[in-house]
């Protein structure tokens, strides 16, 4: 008897892959279930910007043919996934959530897309996002907002909102996002899934539309810790096409996954729990920390004294890099062009005026100002010095602990439209996640329960030493195993 489509959509990634390998289910069945789920739910969710049904069906048939021959490329072989629309995909529209790239068909695939497809994963489409990854609510998408599966009136988080919502709603078994200041971890927390921002350089950025090149990093989102670990193991590793990618060997993240929390030293930054948190979020985070203590971990008080300056430093460094990266969108080589402009300068100005949204324009202005003559030392250079101090704080903290734990966000998912008129309040949603990017460290969000008042998910953030994602997965899995999975969100 075949498995009902809705049950196929809720399978874990590894479980689905094992079913294909055992010929208990086919990749084609999984893909058809995924496509049907997208068609049935995405009118309300808005998680997808493009669905590649024909390409996905062809990949599924190829996976089924391999299974029939007893071949298996990896544990992902034949499983439907999706990627944020920031990754270039050959022949498939890539917009970065912006009108200025509407209709652009890239001539090549991003490295992470190549690696997923080489592993046999079936990419069913491209996911909604804040324009050029600039935002914390997915409301900056030039095409449509994305909605949180737990409550359609709320944000899924940003900028990888579609990546989190699609996984939480069972549209796909895993997804890829990017994280520049919390853009994987915040949506993961808001949508009740696992989201991983790896160490800077662990995953190639080749073929990723750049926002802030010293901060951007690619990572997975999944419903289970082990599934996220498997996807990261698949996409990680050196890429000669990305000069910032590390040559350090990739660990087997699944090997220590079930080692438990006993013996781990969990650092708890006093600055992260000293105010500014909603009561329900703080209660869930403290309960998760108590769970670690019961499981045999030691809680260690640590200090990150310069973390309070992280928002200020980030919103000087990231816009400065964005003002340079986004200069290429001028109507000359690709993207929107103001064909009615009279002269070259007017074409530049009109193409950017019509093609870029309010948030990219705001950040370009911030960055250009920070880099301008007479202000560079006062703003940008000082922000880089603060970045160094933040990195040193983490170095000192890790002298006495193995992982650092705390909240991902100050609140659960907020209402759509609630903060769009107040950019500063929106920026503060990333107050606990930004320092991880500034210090180039790996970070992870794992569900730690539901807020009592709202019934919405709360995420626990775990931060590790450089390239020690394996310990993060071990710690996250220990909590996941003890607390059990969250219930599925309501049907849209």
Swiss-Prot record:
Which Pfam families would you find in this protein's record?
Answer: Amidase
Q: What is its EC number?
A: 6.3.5.7
Name a GO molecular-function annotation: ATP binding
Q: Name one GO cellular component term.
A: glutamyl-tRNA(Gln) amidotransferase complex
Which reactions appear under catalytic activity for this entry? L-glutamyl-tRNA(Gln) + L-glutamine + ATP + H2O = L-glutaminyl-tRNA(Gln) + L-glutamate + ADP + phosphate + H(+)
Question: From which domain of life does this come?
Answer: Bacteria
Instruction: Read off the SUPFAM superfamilies from this record.
Output: Amidase signature (AS) enzymes (SSF75304)
Which of UniProt's keywords are assigned here? ATP-binding, Ligase, Nucleotide-binding, Protein biosynthesis
* Active site (catalytic residues): 84, 159, 183
What residue ranges carry the coiled-coil annotation? Answer: none
Give GO terms for biological process.
Answer: translation
Q: Which family does it belong to?
A: Belongs to the amidase family. GatA subfamily.
Q: What does this protein do?
A: Allows the formation of correctly charged Gln-tRNA(Gln) through the transamidation of misacylated Glu-tRNA(Gln) in organisms which lack glutaminyl-tRNA synthetase. The reaction takes place in the presence of glutamine and ATP through an activated gamma-phospho-Glu-tRNA(Gln).
Describe its partners and assembly state: Heterotrimer of A, B and C subunits.
> What name goes with this protein?
Glutamyl-tRNA(Gln) amidotransferase subunit A
UniProt organism field: Anaeromyxobacter dehalogenans (strain 2CP-1 / ATCC BAA-258)
Q: Which gene encodes it?
A: gatA
């Amino acid at each position: 008897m075949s498995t009902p489509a809705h049950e196929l959509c809720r399978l874990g990634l590894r479980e689905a892959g094992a079913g294909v390998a055992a010929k208990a289910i086919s990749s084609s069945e999984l893909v058809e279930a995924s496509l049907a789920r997208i068609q049935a739910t995405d009118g309300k969710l808005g998680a997808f910007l493009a669905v590649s049904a024909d390409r996905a069906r062809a990949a599924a048939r190829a996976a089924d043919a391999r299974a029939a021959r007893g071949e298996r490329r990896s544990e992902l072989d034949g499983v439907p996934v999706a990627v944020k629309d920031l990754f270039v995909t050959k022949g498939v529209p890539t917009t970065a959530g912006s009108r200025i790239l509407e209709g652009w068909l890239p001539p090549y695939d991003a490295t992470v897309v190549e690696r997923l497809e080489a592993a046999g994963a079936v990419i069913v489409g491209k996911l909604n996002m804040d324009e050029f990854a600039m935002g914390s609510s997915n409301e900056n998408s030039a095409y449509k907002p994305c909605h949180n599966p737990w409550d359609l009136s709320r944000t899924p988080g940003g900028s990888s909102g579609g990546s989190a919502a699609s996984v939480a709603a069972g549209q796909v078994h895993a997804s890829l996002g990017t994280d520049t200041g919390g853009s994987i971890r915040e949506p993961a927390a808001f949508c009740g899934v696992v989201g991983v921002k790896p160490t800077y350089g662990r995953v190639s950025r080749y073929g990723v539309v750049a926002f802030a090149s010293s901060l951007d990093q690619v990572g997975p989102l999944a419903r289970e810790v082990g599934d996220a670990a498997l996807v990261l193991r698949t996409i990680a590793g050196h890429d000669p096409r990305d000069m910032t990618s590390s040559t350090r060997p990739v660990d087997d993240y699944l090997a220590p996954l079930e080692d438990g929390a006993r013996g781990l030293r969990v650092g708890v930054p006093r600055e992260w729990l000293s105010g500014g948190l909603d009561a329900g979020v703080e209660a869930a985070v403290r309960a998760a920390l108590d769970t670690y203590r019961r499981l045999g971990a030691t809680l260690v008080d640590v200090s990150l004294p310069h973390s309070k300056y992280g928002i200020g430093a980030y919103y000087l460094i990231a816009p400065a890099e964005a003002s340079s990266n986004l200069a290429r969108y001028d109507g000359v080589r690709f993207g929107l062009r103001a064909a009615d402009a009279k002269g070259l300068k007017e074409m530049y100005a009109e193409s950017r005026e019509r093609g870029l949204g309010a948030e990219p324009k705001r950040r370009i202005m911030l960055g250009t100002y920070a880099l301008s003559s007479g202000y560079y030392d006062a703003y940008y250079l000082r922000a880089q010095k603060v970045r160094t101090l933040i990195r040193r704080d983490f170095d000192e903290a890790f002298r006495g602990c193995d992982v650092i734990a705390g909240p991902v966000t100050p609140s659960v998912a907020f209402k759509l439209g609630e903060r769009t008129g107040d950019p500063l309040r929106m920026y503060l949603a990333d107050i606990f996640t930004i320092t991880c990017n500034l210090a180039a460290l790996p970070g992870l969000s794992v569900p730690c329960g539901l807020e009592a008042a709202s019934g919405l998910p709360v995420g626990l953030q775990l931060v590790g030493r450089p390239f020690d994602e394996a310990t993060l997965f071990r710690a996250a899995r220990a909590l996941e195993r003890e607390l059990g999975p969250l219930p599925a969100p309501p049907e849209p």
